[in-house]
Amino acid sequence: MTLPTLTNLLIMTLSYILPILIAVAFLTLVERKILSYMQARKGPNIVGPFGLLQPVADGVKLFIKEPIRPSTSSPFLFIITPILALLLALTIWVPLPLPFPLADLNLGLLFLLAMSSLTVYSLLWSGWASNSKYALIGALRAVAQTISYEVTLAIILLSTIMLSGNYTLSTLAITQEPIYLIFSAWPLAMMWYISTLAETNRAPFDLTEGESELVSGFNVEYAAGPFAMFFLAEYANIMLMNTLTTVLFLNPSFLNLPPELFPIALATKTLLLSSSFLWIRASYPRFRYDQLMHLLWKNFLPLTLALCLWHTSMPISYAGLPPI
């Protein structure tokens, strides 16, 4: 590999990673501001104008602190897990069309599904390597929840593939030329949105960090830099899920918009969806664990399977009919 090629690769990678990290940093500020205004207070307003530099101050503070490792923990896994979590959270963005993906994969949706499944390992290893009963119980809860809700996410993705006829994310824009999929497949969109809340361990499904029983969940033993990495990974996953929701169900089209406006439309819709994540956090109490599992296995799974069957059978049944 020549030096110009390496330089080009580095520039491309940085140009796609840095905006994500900056967006994630400011998402934390948006969350604190929204929650504070909902609770009739000001929120962060000291660091910088209107508190805009608060994420920078928080990041610097966390990364210059001394990372503490429990003496009984597993050293290698304890250190490698937060790095793996952040690396996976950033890698998943590769096939997303913003408007052009970093790598236009033929099986982009399957890549997303496979990479999001790998995040389970970072949760499990962090809980196990901490050698703490609270961290382990929190990790087991998180893994059970993530694996469970991935089932419905996969089936809903399969249904959207049936509608678009392709595994690439770019074709979803062409599929949604006449109408957004959120209107034509609204039951799927509703279940997808609730499943993304559970998949990212957000309220009201944040059972992994039940403070009254688990202190803080799987990352209870982490501090300073490693904790910041987990935090960044969690919020990067929230941004990713909302971007994916926009691409799947609210995709702004190439034909209706100039390419320059595509990222603006995508970012606006993603921000609105992320804000509704935060609104839900401020509004709803936490679910009981059995309710969380019943919602998936007894309600969502039969419904998504039926809708997937419907989306599979309808094109076949219409195939023999003459055009209207």
Curated annotation (Swiss-Prot):
The chain crosses the membrane at residues 10-30, 76-96, 107-127, 154-174, 178-198, 230-250, 260-280, 300-320. Keywords: Electron transport, Membrane, Mitochondrion, Mitochondrion inner membrane, NAD, Respiratory chain, Translocase, Transmembrane, Transmembrane helix, Transport, Ubiquinone. InterPro entries: NADH_UbQ_OxRdtase_su1/FPO, NADH_UbQ_OxRdtase_su1_CS. Its EC number is 7.1.1.2. One of its GO terms (biological process) is aerobic respiration. The keyword Phosphoprotein does not apply. GO terms for cellular component: mitochondrial inner membrane; respiratory chain complex I. It comes from the Eukaryota. Pfam families: NADHdh (PF00146). It catalyses: a ubiquinone + NADH + 5 H(+)(in) = a ubiquinol + NAD(+) + 4 H(+)(out). It is an enzyme of class 7 (translocase). GO terms for molecular function: NADH dehydrogenase (ubiquinone) activity. It is found in: Mitochondrion inner membrane. Belongs to the complex I subunit 1 family. Core subunit of respiratory chain NADH dehydrogenase (Complex I) which is composed of 45 different subunits. Core subunit of the mitochondrial membrane respiratory chain NADH dehydrogenase (Complex I) which catalyzes electron transfer from NADH through the respiratory chain, using ubiquinone as an electron acceptor. Essential for the catalytic activity and assembly of complex I. This is NADH-ubiquinone oxidoreductase chain 1. It comes from Gallus gallus (Chicken). The lineage of its organism: Eukaryota, Metazoa, Chordata, Craniata, Vertebrata. The gene is MT-ND1.
